[in-house]
């Protein structure tokens, strides 16, 4: 599944994780909410908060606070050179102030304005871990918390990796290490991984491998 230099391949539509049968004609209306007004309530370095007045599909007028974010990328970097059946995953450990604790995570970061997601993934992997990859596959993309957060997260699989020197930002102190896939899945089963993007990426990757899609 080699990718071109400009684009990452995607998992096929036959992937068992993504090809579940959905109703072709939903029983409920597909009508969207109508935006009446939108006011910028807060603008920070990473995101903005808008207070939106909307008419819901039910006809009810509602006021919603919505966080707008440029989107993020997650990198599931794997080293299959030593043991293709149980490859090594590049992991990070870092302190997260909002969570108030150290977390085990996959490398990730935000997409800068006018930056392509794949370019952001390559940049973030170099900055945080020093690794580069020859093959890139888009595993999935999803909304992080769609009730109030308009942020797409895109998970990329990076293969044929080679190690280099990381270039972390001044406020980042990241420990980088390797974990075998079997060990990572055992950590999930033991409730030791508390980061959502990492859980989604690892479980999707493991399921796709078991189904012979990767």
Roles of regions detected by a PLM:
Residues 58, 79-83, 95, 158-163, ...:
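Short loop segments at secondary-structure junctions
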Residues 37-76, 80:
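Acidic, metal-coordinating catalytic segment for phosphate/diphosphate chemistry
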Residues 62, 73-74, 109-196:
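Unchanged
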Residues 2-28, 33, 102, 113, ...:
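Nudix hydrolase/Nudix homology domain
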Residues 40-44, 97, 142-152, 210:
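Acidic pyrophosphate-coordinating catalytic loop
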Residues 11, 22, 30-33, 64-67, ...:
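Conserved Nudix-box catalytic region and its N-terminal flanking loop in Nudix hydrolases
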């Amino acid at each position: 599944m080699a990718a071109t230099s400009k684009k990452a391949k995607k998992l096929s539509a036959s992937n068992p994780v993504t090809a579940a049968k959905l109703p072709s004609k939903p029983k409920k209306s597909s009508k969207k909410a109508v935006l009446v007004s939108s006011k910028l309530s807060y603008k920070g370095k990473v995101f903005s908060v808008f207070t939106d007045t909307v008419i819901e599909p039910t006809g009810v007028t509602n006021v919603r606070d919505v966080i707008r974010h440029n989107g993020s990328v997650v990198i599931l970097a794997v080293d299959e050179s030593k043991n293709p059946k149980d490859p090594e995953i590049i992991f990070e450990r870092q302190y997260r102030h909002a969570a108030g604790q150290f977390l085990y995570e996959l490398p990730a970061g935000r997409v800068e304005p006018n930056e392509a997601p794949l370019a952001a993934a390559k940049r973030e992997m170099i900055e945080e871990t020093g690794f580069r990859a020859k093959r890139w596959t888009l595993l999935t993309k999803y909304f992080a918390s769609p009730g109030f957060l308009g942020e797409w997260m895109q998970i990329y699989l990076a293969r044929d990796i080679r190690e280099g020197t990381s270039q972390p930002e001044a406020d980042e102190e990241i420990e980088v290490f390797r974990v075998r896939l079997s060990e990572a899945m055992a950590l999930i089963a033991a409730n030791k991984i508390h980061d959502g993007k990492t859980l989604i990426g690892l479980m999707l990757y493991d399921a796709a491998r078991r189904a012979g899609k990767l």
